[in-house]
Amino acid sequence: MFDFRLKVFDTVAKRGNFTKAASELNITQPAVSKHIKEIERLLNTKLFDRNGTKIKLTVSGEILLKYTQKIFGVYSALEFEINQIKQQ
């Protein structure tokens, strides 16, 4: 149900590498780049500082990562509660 772009961002942030994130998510590296660019466009900010093959979260990226974890927690709680209702 959640926005896959957030999963892509989270994976890139944790792996520190677009190619490794692509491999883990079973998508292409250009697809990873596209998802990150879409989020950057929507938020109107850079999420990563790129220096060749090295990437580092910007301050905005660090903030998004913090909220991404909270969002995933909310999604998990939502799915749990919905499943509880279905089992009644």
Feature roles, as predicted:
Residues 84-88:
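Interdomain hinge and pocket-entrance segments immediately C-terminal to HTH DNA-binding domains
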Residues 12-26:
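Short helix-boundary/capping micro-motifs
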Residues 76-83:
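A short, exposed helix-loop element centered on a Lys and neighboring polar residues
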Residues 40-57:
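A short LG(V/I)-centered, amphipathic sequence patch enriched
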Residues 17-18, 36, 50:
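Helix-turn-helix DNA-binding elements, focusing on the entry/boundary residues of the two helices
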Residues 23-24, 41, 62:
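Alpha-helical residues within the helix-turn-helix
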Residues 2-8, 29, 61, 68:
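The N-cap/first-turn positions of alpha helices
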